[in-house]
From Swiss-Prot:
Reported effect, residue 1773 to L: Does not affect oligomerization but lacks transferase activity
EC numbers on record: 2.3.1.86, 1.1.1.100, 2.3.1.41
Lineage per the UniProt record: Eukaryota, Fungi, Dikarya, Ascomycota, Saccharomycotina
SUPFAM superfamilies xrefs: 4'-phosphopantetheinyl transferase, FabD/lysophospholipase-like, NAD(P)-binding Rossmann-fold domains, Thiolase-like
Protein's name according to its UniProt entry: Fatty acid synthase subunit alpha
Organism of derivation: Saccharomyces cerevisiae (strain ATCC 204508 / S288c) (Baker's yeast)
Length: 1887
């Protein structure tokens, strides 16, 4: 047959086949059999877009004809036009053609073996070359890029994955995972690259798709790939490294032709660097690695090319090394000369001096050398330590002011109150008395009211602790009233202590401070000091000795003068009487202690400390002063000296008496320092100065204290001192200061005296205590160095300079009558110890001031008081000597504690001593007799040596004994006694709320609450979570409440931040299960996590300097902006792709030239004069700090896939994690479990955001403008509702309401409000609420422009660290601190929560939002939220009865009785209705009508509960929404314990919010003295905008369930302006209370958004349900907690906390049916174990009519069938809640013992009693006898249950008698009940 005939027949056949297929039924199986079997066709070709029929034919061949073809040796081909064009047209492969041409190219002779030998050396040097050229690599055969590689790269690039992770066997649809937008992007890119695409390419495997493209692919890169490569080169390569350069390098380095270059560049595209490469070398290295990858993909060997290139390069290098340097110089000499001449000519033309810079440089060099020489000289002369030491550190801006004693007084009281209640303080000891004194020192009217409220509301019946706190409180109130107008005093009641050194049997030396036996208080201490000791006794004769000498002299004189015997006798008698008198006289008895008028000598404090507190305000009158007890012959341990004419300072009894009497008064009655202005230096922690500072503040002084180590820790220390001791009127100002700096000394004094207007204090000093010093140890004369000189400068020179500056300031202001008393720190160490540098000289030199006071002109401005400070234990200088202090005291010397020495020094500030100083300088010896110890240094050395020797001997004996013991008893003899250290293990808990015993709940909640509320209208929080700067809600709470992480907190944070991961398997060859370090893979034990990672955790969590890696490289120090510039001259050309070049031309027109580069196909672009450029510039922005999520936080850690992470905005990831954790906190491990209880339409999402996906917005605007790669569907990620959409798509699959609030900073509270409204409206039963917002540079910059945020640079200038830059409510607050994160709560109906058994963290009693007034400022704070306290008062005398819960309960009971009657009537009426229905339909009728009656009864009851329980206050102008919300649960406005403030740390907000809360409380009649405790969470977290209210809500729930109220630890000083708000307390430390009933959360957002929510403790919900229901709920929660705990820990271990859903809980077929059946519920699939909807359960009758309904209908049906013409029927309905099973009298009166036993054993005791009671009532009604009244007992009617038989009736007593009289022979009864009611029907039969 001719070919043309065959072709024509084939055409006809094809046409007929197609016509047959279109026109006839498909009979493809038969058709296949015809051409495969009948005709044995070997080549089948399908004409179509995809191999559909071909695929079927292949399957048919495999299944049916495989053995058939093998038998006949048939080889068949199944081809498709769309993919097998080459095979169909027999097109040869290009590689085959190349292979045929190859032999022709191999005509050149093969290289001989000799070619490998080295070439002979050249006879002469080669010509000099400029550089060694890079040798070209051996070229590799070219091959165009294949479509498969191009397709592979384009898909991988779009999916942001590596080539290895994109299998070519998968389809595009599979790879995108359902992301339609990404799929569309890929298809668009493919169309742009390859032109046309086959039909449905997304469903074709990539390898098949590549083959399809290859047929029409030219091998050249298309538009898309060229554009991507151009972008890669321009954005990631270094400047000048163009695509031409890249191609040239690939050609020369690797010998790759253009096609191969395309392949390498494509591979590079799929491995794009994260950031621009820094240098050309980096770019080449990158290309090298890409070339190797390409070679491995296509199977090319690059080694030969590389070796050829390397060898040639080496040869070139060798040639270059042989160049003659001299010849090169000779050649280039003339060029250099010519260039220099041209340069000089141009300079002369431009009138420039080329040597001017050189001359200036030489001059500057000489100047620098001279300055350096001076510096070197100063360093050599003064020493490095001295030069560095004098650096200035003072700054006015860093001054910290503490003066809010009014607030700390209340805080101290509350702390004391709760410490006693919690048993921390079990009795009133010295510490409590001291705290009482501090409180009295701060007494004011507000404080007294505060105490009166708390003490009057203390319930003594709760236990001894409450009794103690009430007794102490009442005493303290009286004390404060008495001292209300009295100046504060310094009074120390601590027990004086002494040194105690002990050496145990093992030779360990221990030192401790022990109370002194005979000195129990400071008054006795003063007495001890006055008495002195043997060592201080002077060598003066006693009175007796003097009298004896007088007696002897008179006797001798009498003998000479012959005195009469009578006179002698009289004289002898007189002498004898006088001696007797001296012996018995108490006037000079040194052991006699001070006598107090009206007081016992015995220490009252040791007998009864509560009485001591009561006596504190009483001033003691001293009848006999301590000075009168000073022995004549003894010098007191403390005394004043007077200068003798000889210039010595000697003990002066009179002055000392004055001083000691003053100390005594201070010890008994305290001493005030009110209106004293004091400067003190050297008052660091653990110093004498710090104790002096405490006393000054306690006495009401205003003090400036300096510190040389200014830091947050130091300022916190001083703040804690002020908070504890600061009395009313006192002020503490802390400043950085270097006493070694002259500038600092001058600046400090100027700051103190300068006016407030100029930034100074405007003070005039009354006292200066310059105690600053540095230790000098081991420095003898030959080692005097710069440190000694610097110390001398601190301790002498600059003390004098400081005094001089004060004198200068006083003189300048004309202050002549108010001299400042300078307490000079003298020392008894006048070289006694030695080896202390210039310490002794510094102290001795201060004594010159005593003379200069008289000789110079500053006596009117300064007075001098030298204090010789004795041995003071525990200070920085003396702590090493503590162990020998006891030995020193055995010598008779008195050493001192820091408190004792501070007391001594403060005694020098008493008015008596101050007055002495104004007359003449005073020298106070506070040495304790140390100066009387001879050879002190040798003695102390001896003491130390003895201690060490004793220690060593005992240690040796101990070791010897132990060895002997082991020898005798064996090595394991002590094993049983060995100490075993239990290693802690982390156990992260979910912190489900504690569920108290029901009786305890009923003691908390009012009894009337039970059954009062419609629980479907009570909204509860069942779960909450967050992602924030401190990780999760658990870890944030640890840091907020306790200020540190627990072991569990550290483990969780380390896991969150990626420091550790869990390992279960072999590790280094051994099985290991536990945590490992994520980097090293080394095991990490739980106990080591805190020590190993906590520092890093704290550094990279919370509020900190912005970390650029978290924000796309954003560095506020280099905030990027662009500026438009017009090109003034033509620029150098650069390379670009054709497409880019054309775009430049399109924009700039004739201002740009573009030309093609023929070699590469790229374009040269040249910008001409007049073109416009946008040039980046960097701005130094001043907002450098933010609250950032922990570094290392990764959504993948929680189980979120890379696909989702790459697709969504980061804020969406925060939300997804928060929602999952909130569900886990709810005990819900599978969100589909909700659909077991509710319909899919009843789960809503009301979470929202202030700005939404700001990263997406940034991509849309900034990145897109910069033409950076941005996903095409970025728009969808910017929508604020997208986050909620992802939650639904990945987790919950609900079809309920979705509402997206946008309320700026008030979004979260608005979300709660909307969620509550959504549930109350019936649109949902469960809602996800919360808020979220991100931090990005754009928002940060704009907030900064508004001056709303904290200026970091200013904060640094003020010495603030990032952690303390958010300081709500403080004097220095200066703007809010931005943060990022998400917060979520799960809220639902209380009734549903109880049924599900989920934990209930709190009740949302109220949620509201409000706007403000007319204005022009969007962010201005307002008070619109005050409307939640709106309440009409006018002249209404009595409160609304609706506020009385008993009244409301009474109304509800009445209404319940009506409902009961209605149900009974309706059920009885059913009998008549049923008679009208055909008998075959009666059962159905009764079922439906019974259900309707039940529904209506339930509806009526809920309406009644709603009216009298939930909504009684609504629309009542006399009851504020806030008051009504609390009253719903039996609470009053006084029960609102905590207010969580929005507290942004801005001046305006904190004042406005405080005023708003204060006015609410005041208007609603909150009791005076009962402020709400303010919580300011943002001090820790910063301000996350949309998430703010959610985090506050989480914190409020944690407060409710723990009773712990976190303090605002950044509140170093509360603003004075806030003192006016009496109903708010601002604590700075955490308070552990005995319970919090309710918490308010307020939130304010830009745009007139104000919001408030009230959450109430869940105990008040439990009080509203029955005990049975509560116990059932407790069991459910317990089970749920266990499963949630297991799920959570497995999730952490395996990184599976987030488990995304792949499918909805219903099939596509059931989707519409599920939506349309509100009673559709999921059930567990037996095969898969998953929760799904089953078609059997949709529109099922069982889901509407339950078993109880069937039972009730059956009873009614039986009733209708009974023939009761001679009998009676009784129907009774009882609400379950109406039976009070707690009333024992009611139970025993109406139920028999058997009935009680039966009912009590049932799962629902109350329901069983209700059913039994209902049966009794029904029986009575069926008897038809006369009632004995509503109060008649029904015990005579007994309902008997035998086994599981139906209940029977037995009548007794009066009931039996009445039945017999009525002729009743039998009674039958039926009972049914559900959660709402019990129904009983009784039928009686008569004779």
């Amino acid at each position: 047959m001719k070919p043309e005939v065959e072709q024509e027949l084939a055409h006809i056949l094809l046409t007929e086949l197609l016509a047959y297929q279109f026109a006839s039924p498909v009979r493809w199986i038969e058709t296949q059999d015809v051409f495969l079997k009948d005709f044995n066709t070997e080549r089948v070709v399908e004409i179509g877009p995809s191999p559909t029929l071909a695929g079927m034919a292949q399957r048919t061949l495999k299944n049916k004809y495989e053995s058939y073809d093998a038998a006949l040796s048939l080889h068949r081909e199944i081809l498709c036009y769309s993919k097998d064009a080459k095979e169909i047209y027999y097109t040869p492969d290009p590689s085959e053609l190349a292979a045929k041409e190859e032999p022709a190219k191999e005509e050149a002779p093969a290289p001989t073996p000799a070619a490998s030998a080295p070439a002979p050396a050249a006879a002469a040097p080669a010509p000099v070359a400029a550089a060694a050229p890079a040798a070209a690599a051996a070229e590799i055969a070219d091959e165009p890029v294949k479509a498969s590689l191009l397709l592979h790269v384009l898909v991988a690039h779009k999916l942001k994955k590596s080539l290895d992770s994109i299998p070519m066997s998968k389809t595009i649809k599979d790879l995108v995972g359902g992301k339609s937008t990404v799929q569309n992007e890929i298809l668009g890119d493919l169309g742009k690259e390859f032109g046309t695409t086959p039909e449905k390419p997304e469903e074709t495997p990539l390898e098949e798709l590549a083959e399809t493209f290859q047929d029409t692919f030219s091998g050249a890169l298309g538009k898309q790939s060229s554009s991507l490569l151009s972008r890669l080169i321009s954005s990631k390569m270094p400047g000048g490294f163009t695509i031409t350069v890249a191609r040239k390098y690939l050609q020369t380095r690797w010998g790759l032709p253009s096609g191969r270059q395309d392949g390498v560049l494509l591979v590079a595209l799929s491995n794009e660097p994260a950031a621009r490469l820094g240098s050309e070398a980096d770019a080449k290295a990158f290309l090298d690695s890409m070339a190797q990858k390409y070679a491995s993909i296509v199977g090319v060997d690059l080694s030969s090319a590389a070796s050829a290139s390397g060898a040639a390069g080496a040869g070139a290098a060798a040639g270059a090394a042989m160049i003659d340097a001299g010849a090169l110089e000779e050649i280039t000499k003339d060029h250099k000369v010519l260039a220099r001449q041209q340069l000089q000519v141009l300079a002369r033309y431009l009138k420039m001096d080329l040597d001017n810079g050189e001359r200036k440089f030489l001059k500057e060099k000489d100047t620098v050398a001279e300055l350096q020489a001076q510096l070197d000289y100063l360093n050599a002369e003064l020493g490095e330590f001295f030069v560095n030491g004098v650096a200035t550190s003072f700054s006015r801006k860093k001054a910290r002011t503490f003066d809010s004693s009014w607030n700390w007084a209340k805080q101290s009281l509350l702390s004391l109150y709760f410490e006693i209640i919690h048993g921390v303080l079990k009795n009133v000891d010295r510490e409590v008395v001291s705290e009482a004194i501090n409180i009295m020192n701060r007494s004011n009217d507000a404080l007294i009211k505060f105490m009166e409220y708390h003490i009057s509301n203390t319930d003594e019946t709760k236990g001894e602790n409450y009794q103690l706190v009430k007794t102490l409180g009442e005493q303290l109130i009286e004390n404060c009233k008495q001292v209300l107008d009295v100046d504060p005093v310094y009074k120390d009641v601590a027990k004086p202590t002494g040194p105690k050194t002990a050496i145990d049997k093992n030779g360990n030396i221990t030192y401790s401070e022990e109370p002194r036996e005979k000195v129990r208080k400071l008054s006795q201490y003063v007495q001890e000091m006055a008495l002195g000791g043997p060592i201080t006794k002077e060598s003066q004769p006693t009175i007796e000795e003097d009298l004896t000498r007088v007696y002897k002299a008179i006797s001798a004189q009498a003998d000479k003068q012959d005195i009469s015997s009578s006179t002698r006798v009289e004289f002898e008698k007189l002498y004898s009487d006088l001696m007797k008198f001296l012996e018995s006289s108490k006037e000079i008895d040194p052991s006699q202690t001070t006598q107090l008028a009206g007081m016992d000598v015995e220490d009252a404090l040791d007998k009864d400390s509560t009485k001591e507190v009561a006596s504190l305000p009483n001033k003691s009158t001293i009848s006999k002063t301590v000075s009168s007890t000073i022995p004549r012959e003894t010098i007191p341990f403390l005394h004043l000296r007077k200068k003798t004419p000889a210039g010595d300072w000697k003990y002066d009894r009179q002055l000392s008496s004055l001083f000691l009497d003053g100390l005594e008064k201070a010890a008994f009655n305290g001493v005030t320092f009110k209106d004293k202005y004091v400067l003190i230096t050297g008052a660091g922690k653990g110093s004498i100065g710090a104790e002096v500072l405490q006393g000054l503040l306690q006495g009401g002084a205003k003090v400036v204290v300096t510190t040389s180590r200014f830091s947050k820790q130091v300022t916190d220390y001083y703040q804690s001192i002020y908070a504890k001791y600061g009395a009313k009127g006192s002020t503490l100002i802390v400043v950085p200061f270097n006493q070694g700096s002259k500038q600092d000394v001058e600046a400090l004094i100027e700051f103190i005296y300068d006016t407030e207007k100029n930034g100074g204090l405007g003070w005039d000093l009354d006292a200066i205590i310059p105690f600053a010093a540095i230790p000098e140890q081991g420095i003898e004369l030959e080692h005097i160095d710069s440190k000694s000189e610097f110390a001398h400068r601190i301790m002498l020179t600059n003390i004098l300079r400081m005094m001089g500056c004060v004198k200068k300031q006083k003189s300048a202001r004309g202050i002549e009558t108010r001299p400042a008393q300078v307490i000079l720190p003298m020392s008894p160490n006048h070289g006694t110890f030695g080896g202390d540098g210039m310490y002794s000289e510094s102290k001795l030199s201060l004594e010159t001031l005593f003379n200069r006071w008289h000789s110079e002109s500053w006596a009117n401005q300064l007075t001098v008081c030298g204090a010789i400070i004795g041995w003071t234990r525990g200070t920085g200088l003396m702590s090493a000597n503590n162990i020998i202090a006891e030995g020193i005291e055995k010598m008779g010397v008195r050493t001192f504690s820091q408190k004792e020495m501070a007391f001594n020094l403060l005694g020098l500030l008493t008015p008596e001593v101050v007055e002495l100083c104004q007359k003449s300088p005073v020298m106070a010896d506070l040495n304790g007799g140390l100066q009387f110890v001879p050879e002190l240094k040798e003695f102390t050395a001896k003491l130390r040596k003895e201690l060490v020797e004793t220690s060593e001997v005992r240690k040796a004996v101990s070791i010897e004994t132990a060895l002997e013991h082991k020898v005798v008893n064996g090595n394991s003899a002590d094993a049983a006694y060995a100490q075993v250290e239990i290693q802690p293990r982390a156990n992260i808990q979910l912190d489900f709320p504690e569920l108290k015993p029901y009786k305890q709940v009923k003691q908390i909640a009012p009894a009337e609450l039970e059954g009062l509320l419609d629980l479907e209208r009570v909204i509860v929080v069942t779960g909450f979570a967050e992602v924030g700067p401190w990780g999760s809600a658990r870890t944030r709470w640890e840091m907020e409440a306790f200020g540190e992480f627990s072991l569990e907190g550290c483990v969780e944070m380390a896991w969150i931040m990626g420091f550790i991961s869990y390992h279960n398997g072999n590790l280094k060859g051994r099985p290991y299960t536990g945590w490992v370090d994520s980097k090293t893979k080394e095991p990490v034990d739980d106990k080591d996590v805190k020590a190993k990672y906590e520092t890093s955790i704290l550094e990279h969590s919370g509020i900190r300097l912005i970390e650029p890696e978290l924000f796309n490289g954003y560095n506020p120090e280099k905030k990027e902006m662009i500026q438009e510039v017009i090109v003034e001259e033509d620029l150098e050309p650069f390379e670009a792709s054709k497409e880019t070049a054309e775009q430049f031309k399109h924009q700039h027109g004739d201002k740009v030239d573009i030309f093609e580069i023929p070699e590469t196909g790229e374009y040269s672009v040249k910008l001409l004069k007049g073109a416009t450029l946008y040039i980046p510039k960097a701005l130094r922005f001043d907002r450098l700090v933010a609250g950032q999520i922990p570094t290392g936080w990764n959504a993948k850690t929680y189980g979120i896939s890379d696909d989702i992470i790459s697709q969504v905005d980061p804020i969406t990831l925060f939300v997804l994690v928060s929602v999952v954790e909130a569900f886990i906190a709810s005990g819900i491990t599978d969100p589909y479990e909700m659909y077991k209880y509710v319909h899919v339409s009843e789960v809503g999402n009301c979470s929202g955001s202030g700005m939404g996906g700001v990263s997406a917005l940034r991509g849309m605007f900034k990145d897109r403008f910069k033409d950076e790669p941005v996903q095409n569907d970025i728009l969808q990620e910017s929508f604020i509702n997208t986050m909620s959409a992802w939650v639904n798509m990945l987790l919950i699959s609900s079809s309920g309401p979705i509402k997206t609030p946008v309320g700026a900073c008030a979004t979260s509270v608005e979300s709660v409000d909307i969620g509550v409204e959504t549930i109350l409206s019936g649109k949902a039963r469960i809602c996800i609420v919360g808020g979220y917002d991100d931090f990005q540079e754009e928002g940060s910059f704009e907030f900064g422009n508004m001056k709303a945020t904290s200026n970091t640079l200013e904060e640094f200038e003020h010495g603030r660290t990032p952690a303390e830059m958010s300081r709500p409510a403080t004097t220095t607050r200066n703007g809010f601190m931005e943060a990022q994160g998400a917060g979520i709560q799960i809220i639902m109906q209380a009734d549903l929560a109880l049924k599900m058994g989920v934990p209930i963290y709190g009740i949302v009693a109220m949620a509201a939002t409000a706007t403000d007034k007319i204005g022009r400022s969007v962010p201005a704070p307002g008070k619109g939220i005050l409307t939640t306290a709106r309440e009409h008062h006018s002249s209404v005398k009595y409160a609304s009865p609706n506020l009385n819960m008993k009244y409301r309960k009474r109304q509800l009971v009445t209404r319940e009785a009506q409902i009961k009657d209605w149900v009974e009537n309706e059920l009885e009426a059913l009998k008549l209705e049923a008679e009208e229905i055909p008998s075959e339909d009666q059962n159905e009728f009764l079922l439906e009508r019974t259900r309707e009656i039940h529904n209506e009864a339930e509806s009526q009851l809920r309406a009644a509960q709603q009216q009298w329980g939930n909504d009684f206050y609504k629309r009542d102008p006399r009851i504020a929404p806030l008051r009504g919300a609390l009253a719903t649960y039996g609470l009053t406005i006084d029960d609102l314990g905590v207010a969580s403030f929005h507290g942004t740390s801005t001046k305006a907000n904190d004042k406005n919010e405080s005023a708003t809360i204060n006015e609410m409380m005041k208007h609603l009649g909150r009791s005076e003295g009962n402020p709400v405790i303010g919580v300011f969470q943002k001090f820790l977290t910063g301000h996350p905008k949309g998430a703010a209210g959610a985090w506050m809500m989480n914190g409020a729930l944690q407060i409710l369930n723990s009773g712990i109220i976190p303090g605002n630890r950044n509140a170093d000083n509360v603003d004075k302006i806030l003192e006016q708000f009496e109903y708010v307390l601002y604590p700075s430390k955490t308070l552990k209370t005995d319970g919090v009933r309710a918490v308010s959360i307020t939130s304010f957002g830009f745009g007139q958004k104000g919001g408030q929510a009230i959450v109430v403790h869940p105990d008040y919900l439990y009080g509203a349900i029955t005990e049975d229901r509560y116990n059932e709920y407790v069991a459910k929660v317990s089970a749920r907690e266990k499963s949630a705990y297991k799920f959570f820990h497995n999730g952490m271990i395996y990184n599976k906390l987030f488990v995304s859903k792949e499918h909805a809980p219903y099939t596509d077929e059931l989707e519409e049916d599920v939506y349309l059946d509100p009673l559709a519920r999921v059930s567990k699939d037996k095969k898969s174990g998953s929760l799904t909807f089953n078609s059997k359960n949709i529109q099922s009758k069982d889901s509407y009519i339950n078993a109880n309904t069937i039972e009730t209908a059956k009873m009614i049906e039986n009733m209708t069938k009974e023939k009761v013409s001679n009998g009676g029927v009784g129907v009774d309905v009882e609400l379950i809640t109406s039976i009070n099973v707690e009333n024992d009298t009611f139970i025993e009166r109406n139920f028999t013992p058997q009935e009680i036993e039966y009912c009590s054993a049932q799962p629902s005791v109350q329901s069983s009693f209700a059913g039994t009671w209902s049966a009794k009532e029904a029986v009575f009604k069926s008897l038809g006898v006369k009632s004995l009244g509503g109060g008649a007992a029904l015990k005579d009617i007994e309902i008997v249950r035998v086994n599981k038989n139906a209940p029977a009736v037995e009548l007794h007593g009066n009931a039996k008698k009445a039945a017999e009289e009525a002729g009743v022979t039998d009674v039958k009864v039926s009972i049914s009940h559900d959660d709402l009611q019990a129904v009983a029907v009784a039928v009686s039969t008569k004779k």
